Amino acid sequence: MEAIAKHRYARTSAQKARLVADQVRGLSVDKALNILTFSPKKAAVLVKKVLESAIANAEHNEGADIDALRVATIMVDEGPSMKRIRPRAKGRADRILKRTAHITVVVSDAKAGR
């Protein structure tokens, strides 16, 4: 049994979100939530919300036991970048890329070996 949750166009760079995702990959959901709760990174809040959504999906849609769930897969892909302009001296301008990320979390019970 698997349950999926996604956060598309998350306002953080994929590089920064991957640092957080790598910490919880393969852990049980209660351990992962504990790590994310006390992480000082902004991306930890985003990943935690997606993980909580995946847990709720597993409980509601599949009737899963929350204590048996673990983070089977967690992926952070790049989303589109928003282009912004910062004015500079002598009429020039610099381009700023405000990056986004797509965060995908898959939780499964221990019986579904992967």
Swiss-Prot record:
Keywords: Ribonucleoprotein, Ribosomal protein, RNA-binding, rRNA-binding. GO terms for molecular function: rRNA binding; structural constituent of ribosome. The keyword Manganese does not apply. Pfam families: Ribosomal_L22. The keyword Thylakoid does not apply. One of its GO terms (biological process) is translation. InterPro entries: Ribosomal_uL22, Ribosomal_uL22_bac/chlpt-type, Ribosomal_uL22_bac/org-type, Ribosomal_uL22_CS, Ribosomal_uL22_sf. One of its GO terms (cellular component) is cytosolic large ribosomal subunit. SUPFAM superfamilies: Ribosomal protein L22. It comes from the Bacteria. NCBIfam families: rplV_bact. Part of the 50S ribosomal subunit. Belongs to the universal ribosomal protein uL22 family. This protein binds specifically to 23S rRNA; its binding is stimulated by other ribosomal proteins, e.g. L4, L17, and L20. It is important during the early stages of 50S assembly. It makes multiple contacts with different domains of the 23S rRNA in the assembled 50S subunit and ribosome. The globular domain of the protein is located near the polypeptide exit tunnel on the outside of the subunit, while an extended beta-hairpin is found that lines the wall of the exit tunnel in the center of the 70S ribosome. This is Large ribosomal subunit protein uL22. It comes from Aeromonas salmonicida (strain A449).
